[in-house]
UniProtKB/Swiss-Prot annotation:
SMART domains, sorted: Elp3 (SM00729)
Keywords: 4Fe-4S, Cytoplasm, Iron, Iron-sulfur, Metal-binding, S-adenosyl-L-methionine, Transferase
Keyword Transmembrane helix carried by entry: no
GO MF annotation, one: protein methylthiotransferase activity
Protein name: Ribosomal protein uS12 methylthiotransferase RimO
UniProt GO BP: tRNA modification
Catalysed conversion reaction: L-aspartate(89)-[ribosomal protein uS12]-hydrogen + (sulfur carrier)-SH + AH2 + 2 S-adenosyl-L-methionine = 3-methylsulfanyl-L-aspartate(89)-[ribosomal protein uS12]-hydrogen + (sulfur carrier)-H + 5'-deoxyadenosine + L-methionine + A + S-adenosyl-L-homocysteine + 2 H(+)
Sites where the protein binds [4Fe-4S] cluster 2: 151, 155, 158
InterPro entries, per the entry: Elp3/MiaA/NifB-like_rSAM, Methylthiotransferase, Methylthiotransferase_CS, Methylthiotransferase_N, Methylthiotransferase_N_sf, NA-bd_OB-fold, Ribosomal_uS12_MeSTrfase_RimO, rSAM
Cofactor(s) needed: [4Fe-4S] cluster
Positions annotated to bind [4Fe-4S] cluster 1: 17, 53, 82
Main location: cytoplasm
Pfam families named in the record: Radical_SAM, TRAM_2, UPF0004
Amino acid sequence: MSTTPATPKVGFVSLGCPKALVDSERILTQLRMEGYEVVPTYEDADVVVVNTCGFIDSAKAESLEVIGEAIKENGKVIVTGCMGVEEGSIRDVHPSVLSVTGPQQYEQVVNAVHEVVPPRQDHNPLIDLVPPQGVKLTPRHYAYLKISEGCNHSCSFCIIPSMRGKLVSRPVGEVLSEAERLVKAGVKEILVISQDTSAYGVDVKYKTDFWNGRPVKTRMLELCEALSSLGAWVRLHYVYPYPNVDDVIPLMAAGKILPYLDIPFQHASPKVLKSMKRPAFEDRTLARIKNWREQCPELVIRSTFIVGFPGETEEDFQYLLDWLTEAQLDRVGCFQYSPVEGAPANDLGLEEVPDDVKQERWDRFMAHQQAISSARLQLRIGKEIEVLIDEVEEQGSVGRSFFDAPEIDGSVFIDGDHGLKPGDKVRCRVVDADEYDMWAEPV
């Protein structure tokens, strides 16, 4: 008597940034198309895939810890992602891993899964359909849209180019077709991501591609114009402060894409920026920020900074605080510098900043910026905003405005039962705010 073969089961752990999350979605989509079931526990899986992060040492430590946990609970573990480029470092700690691959090596990961637990030969893809937009690890109403891989910069604190390579832009027609599928599937917000969004198309000399029969240049401006036609919120992340950023501000002012720019400035001191191998035109950047806000008064600017970089003096740090006062950024994150193995910053010969000084500067930075962020949000009280609902709780709903990217920014809280559900958009009036969040009521 014949029996139906068991459905192969895969456990999956995705660590790191949204770019890695998109890689995980791509791998999972392929496995689902081949009939694999993705399970939430180690013990139910035939094999576990861990997509690692290797950006900083603490991320590597977390990756190694998760790999060890998966080995302990399951025993059959495949490793991929950014830390995968350091196979020796992984096998030194966990010699029993079955396979190690770097980022973007989707086919190799799927093949490694095949070797452990082959797909069912009788799988009928018409029975177990994968949605056209693929498997998504985000809530249904928003999705990350990765437009390129790699980076052409050589920031001294970063090892991304050594892990993900030089800039490779996806064909704009392919990107727009994916965005179109996402919107048709119910996505209300598209978060454009890459290592360097403003450099999109540089590697292909902004070549013309086609989308729905019409020509579109492989360039950030034309991409944003086309995305704006889909009717979803469009939010730009990881924008390098190139002059061509000026070109998208009119689209924001016209309401075509969200008036939100995620630009990692990293520092303001010309000396520190030079050591970081970042653009050291902080005064010019302030002038550009002023110009952007004159064109688009609603513009929200998010950024990230590093304190305690080798050679940073108290004078450099005070310069940064003064720059923040001038810039009046809305959303800001800050990291204490942590040496990364293989980063050029390790060989600059600059004096290390003691850990206690790093902590003290981080505390001062956060207090300084919190006051700025709070003052800027206070200006929203009494004004109307559109809110995208993320979740509904017993006491009310939690959502986000154009001010807020998921995971990294604040929230908008709406008290009471208003019949809302995740993915709804609702017009609200802001009634209160602190340094991160807003409270609002429907109008």
